[in-house]
Structure formats: structure tokens, C-alpha cells
Amino acid sequence: MPINCKSQCGNRAALKRPKTGDALCKECFFAAFEAEIHHTISSSNLFRRGEKVAVAASGGKDSTVLAHVLKLLNERHNYGLELVLLSIDEGITGYRDDSLETVKQNRDDYQMPLKILSYEELYGWTMDRIVAQIGRSNNCTFCGVFRRQALDRGAKLLGVDSIATGHNADDIAETVLMNVLRGDTARLRRCTSIRTGGGEDTIPRVKPLKYSYEKEIVMYAHYKKLVYFSTECVFAPNAYRGHARAFLKDLEKVRPSVIMDIIYSGEQLRFKDTVKKPERGICTRCGFVSSQQPCKACVLLEGLNRGLPKLGIGKKSKGERMIAKQDQELALRERANLVKNDF
């Protein structure tokens, strides 16, 4: 038997919202989805009139829906924002090269300027080459660190006031779980924040989709017929996040509200004053924000360039010993060559 739309618009329901369980027609779902994102933006004061905002664009469902909705809300509610697309090319054959074509389609569809930065031009490496050297066990560590800094570099280059990322409610709940399981209190403090950074030397990042369910983002993109890239990264199956995602899906089967429950729990967490907060400063090598000297990106890059790919994996003291050992070996070789040349 057909079900009427719960909003009493007179139309038949076309879907059931995963977040609320409401039976809605497509138009009422669009209106509710967009209104919730507008409420998130306005209640959290994410933007100010006249600001230039970079939308972190990957071509996937989240960034595509984010670009579409931000453009729509910017016009509907007169935010007064200048929107641009910022995309990072990690150099993953068969994945990123294809998804960038979707990003270019987004550029044309939404009439937004697009800037693409590659790992190759920023670091002299592609993820394909990195994985060839390190294998698949820690590749997501390299990619995540380089990608975060690449977005900062791109944002600085574009002169934007903030970066809008497509992190959704599922992503944030997964991150809370990951940080709890790893005992990472530093990241646990800030992983539910809708705005991060924004100090004197940093460009803030905002998450307009923080309370949007992944399933609803997919439904919105589907019913709106948005063009997006849906293939998973070829290196992602071994990522630690995948285990947190699987665990979250299992929890959701027995408690449908678990995603929002975890986010709200993360927001309410308090730490003792005795728990030390990592101090964020500026990397003395690259000049970008870091909680260590040198920053993680510079340490990982040094390891790759030295042929010590595991330099930035694990404890800092271990990395320092690896550098000292290699420097000692190089010094011994140079000394041996000098002695040889003397004869």
C-alpha cells in the first residue's frame, strides 16, 4: 500500500530517511537535507559574508554533494561567499586520474574555478612510487599526512579564508572510534570539532556535512542525478579506518542512532587538566603548522628521499637513530673513498 509523505505535502513517499526514519517524497527530502546543512552552517557561524572558501574536491559523493549544496545555499540564503574548488592529485593510477575527470565536470556544472595540486609537484613523489617503495602496510599514513598539508598549501596559494571538507557524520563517528581504540587523546580532543585550525598562521577547516549521514548523502546525489566518482581507492582496503567502519556498521544494525550517539559523546568528552595538550607550532623546514619539529610531512619526505621509508613510522627516537646510523655509514664510506683515492 502506498505511503503518503510525512510532511503532508500531498505526494507519495519515495524514500525512508535513514537518519529519522521519516517517509518522504523526493522534494521534501531535498528540502529537509538542505535545511539541516543550512542550520549547521548558520548555527555554527562557519562563514562570514565576503569570504573566499575552497571546497576540497575529490570527485566523490561527499565533496560533490558539498559543492552542489554550498552553491545552492550560497545563492538561496545570500551567504555572499566566493566558492572555488581545490583538488589534490596523489598520483594513484586508475583511481585519482579518473576521479579528477569528475572534478572537472563539477567545475563545469557548478561554474567554480578549480585548482589542482599534485604530490609530484609538491613533494617530488606520487603515491604509486611511494607504495612501490614501502609496500601497502603504511601507505595511508603517507597519503593522509601529505594530503592534509597539500590542502593547506593549496589554500594558501589560493588566498582563501577557509577550507570546506566533505567529512560526514559517519566519518566523524569512525574517527572517534579510531582515536578511542588507539588511545590518541590529542586527536580525540578535536576530531568532533566542526571547525579546526584558524590560528594566526593557519587557515581553518570547516565541516558543513558534520551531521549528514553517508546514506542520505548517497540518496541525495542519486535522486539529484549528480555526477560523482564512486570507486574506492585501490590502496584503501588495508587502512585501519576500514576496521572502525565495519565495527560501526555492526553497531548500527542493533542501534540505528549510534552514529549521532558517538558524535555527541565525543563532543561532551572532557580531559583532566593533567593530560598534556600537544602544542601546535610552525615547522622550521616547510613553514606549515605542526605539533612536532620537524613536521610529520617533512619527516616522511626525508625518509623517502634517504631511502628510509619507515623513518616517520613509529617513535621519533627510532627515526633519529635510523638517521644517525645512515649518516655514520655515509661518513665511513666517504672516508674509505678518500683513503682509496690517496693510493
Swiss-Prot record:
The keyword tRNA-binding applies. The keyword Signal does not apply. Pathway: tRNA modification; 5-methoxycarbonylmethyl-2-thiouridine-tRNA biosynthesis. Its EC number is 2.7.7.-. GO terms for cellular component: cytosol; cytosolic tRNA wobble base thiouridylase complex; mitochondrion. It is found in: Cytoplasm. InterPro entries: CTU1-like_ATP-bd, CTU1_C, Ncs6/Tuc1/Ctu1, Rossmann-like_a/b/a_fold, TilS/TtcA_N, tRNA_thiolation_TtcA_Ctu1, UPF0021_CS. Keywords: Cytoplasm, RNA-binding, Transferase, tRNA processing, tRNA-binding. GO terms for biological process: protein urmylation; tRNA thio-modification; tRNA wobble position uridine thiolation; tRNA wobble uridine modification. CDD domains: CTU1-like (cd01713). Pfam families: ATP_bind_3 (PF01171), zn-ribbon_14 (PF16503). It comes from the Eukaryota. One of its GO terms (molecular function) is tRNA binding. Plays a central role in 2-thiolation of mcm(5)S(2)U at tRNA wobble positions of tRNA(Lys), tRNA(Glu) and tRNA(Gln). Directly binds tRNAs and probably acts by catalyzing adenylation of tRNAs, an intermediate required for 2-thiolation. It is unclear whether it acts as a sulfurtransferase that transfers sulfur from thiocarboxylated URM1 onto the uridine of tRNAs at wobble position. Belongs to the TtcA family. CTU1/NCS6/ATPBD3 subfamily. HAMAP family: CTU1 (MF_03053). This is Cytoplasmic tRNA 2-thiolation protein 1. It comes from Drosophila erecta (Fruit fly).
